[in-house]
Design a protein with these regions (language model features):
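Short, flexible loop/turn elements at secondary-structure junctions
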Residues: 81-83, 99-106, 130
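Short amphipathic alpha-helix segments
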Residues: 105-123
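DNA replication initiation on ssDNA origins
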Residues: 1-96
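Histidine-centered divalent-metal-coordination microenvironment in nucleic-acid enzymes
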Residues: 100, 123-134
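Short, well-ordered loop/turn elements at secondary-structure boundaries
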Residues: 93-95, 119-122, 132-133
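Short, charge-rich binding segments
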Residues: 89-91, 117-118, 127-128
Length: 134
């Protein structure tokens, strides 16, 4: 199994835009490991690091059990910026990214296509959440 560090390649900020905080699991860990870029997040999401956990999460039928599993087993980011600690008052630098999270939306592909086709809305990164529901 690969490590998060193997999936998160250092990329110059000027080349790939804003950076934001990356946190190791569990969700109650509020201390960031490092700042990463959208490219790093893409490499993490499309890599194998969380593949096993994602498959397990998607096989859990009970929402409460799935939410508890997700909280314990997934690393996470704060797309809004870099933080000293995950707390609104601890923002170091904002990204100016708008993060939209749509869960349990019927015909999600239609909305994906609309966002991607809209010339007024620049999509930097779009992905399906680990639950497969958003």
């Amino acid at each position: 199994m690969s490590t998060p560090e193997a999936n998160l390649k250092e990329v110059p900020r000027l080349v790939f835009g804003p950076q934001f905080s990356f946190y190791r699991k569990p969700i109650w860990n509020t201390n960031p490991l490092k700042a990463i870029s959208l490219y790093d997040a893409y490499a993490y999401i499309t890599g194998d690091y969380a593949k096993e956990q994602t498959e397990r999460l998607r096989s859990i039928p009970d929402k409460k059990v799935a939410d508890a599993y997700k909280a314990k087993n997934f690393d996470y980011v704060t797309f809004g910026g870099t933080f000293t600690v995950r707390d609104d008052d601890q923002l170091i630098f904002p990204t100016d990214l708008l993060c939209l999270d749509f869960d349990h939306v019927p015909n999600v592909q239609m909305y994906r296509n609309q966002f991607l086709a809209d010339p007024e809305f620049e999509t930097a990164l779009m992905f399906t959440s680990p639950s497969g529901q958003g």
